[in-house]
Amino acid sequence: MSLKKSPFFELRSGSVDTLLFTVKTTDLDALRTELVKRFEATPEFFADDVVAIDVRRLADGERVELADIRQMLNDVRMRPVGVVALATQGWAGEAGLPLLEARDRRVSAAKPDEAEPAPVVADAVAAATTAEPAPEPAPTQISAGGQTLVIDRPLRSGQQIYAKGDLVVLAPVSHGAEIIAEGNIHIYAPLRGRALAGVHGNHDARIFCTCLEPELISIAGIYRTTENPLPADILGKAVQIRLEEEKLMIEPLRLT
């Protein structure tokens, strides 16, 4: 093999962070029912996120059909990219998904049943609909039905805000943070994470932002990601985003 550097591509070692979907049961019917139930209220919460299937919490001798779990995750618009398993779970490599090495250091090889559990996607979704804001970190805050929710603190990576009415954000939304509203979203600061308005099909919802640098924007399920770069005349600028004939329209805002 030639070691000459190619001007067209490059292979390098690297790492990519993903969500872990931790399987704690072999009852796939119950798992499917719970997964659908959790995603009904916020179907876009983890839409298009990559996820690794973590089977380390299963008891010795237990196994699941990973192909079925893969399909479940696809059905809720998540993208399984691999499996995290213990060395004794050789069957995990039979599903056609690569075996991944988790870096969370939360499962002890000697006594996995006593280890702190790895992140669970289903638990994270539950937080989107049931949790009270926690001081450190505060993963989710939810407004009362129909009321405007005002957030005046910066949102860090991994934090999520859900508003049942309109949402007003007065501080930066960092990469990896997510703001979701059933109504309009107003962001008077840089948006570098995700903003999803009109999540229950409100096509009249809009997003207003004074500095647009997003990972994802969405209205009523119609979304745009950074895979489709924003034009220079709106990137980092004040804009409004609305729907017109099922297309996202991003228009400059004249603030003076």
Curated annotation (Swiss-Prot):
SUPFAM superfamilies membership: Cell-division inhibitor MinC, C-terminal domain
Q: Which GO biological process annotations does it have?
A: cell morphogenesis; division septum assembly; regulation of cell division; regulation of cell septum assembly
InterPro entries recorded for this chain?
CAP/MinC_C (IPR016098), MinC (IPR013033), MinC_C_sf (IPR036145), MinC_N (IPR007874), Septum_form_inhib_MinC_C (IPR005526)
Transmembrane regions: none
- Keywords, comma-separated and alphabetical: Cell cycle, Cell division, Septation
Q: What does this protein do?
A: Cell division inhibitor that blocks the formation of polar Z ring septums. Rapidly oscillates between the poles of the cell to destabilize FtsZ filaments that have formed before they mature into polar Z rings. Prevents FtsZ polymerization.
The similarity comment for this entry is: Belongs to the MinC family.
PANTHER family the record matches: SEPTUM SITE-DETERMINING PROTEIN MINC (PTHR34108:SF1)
Q: How does it assemble?
A: Interacts with MinD and FtsZ.
* HAMAP family given in the database record: MinC
- Indicate what this protein is called per its UniProt record: Probable septum site-determining protein MinC
This protein's encoding gene: minC
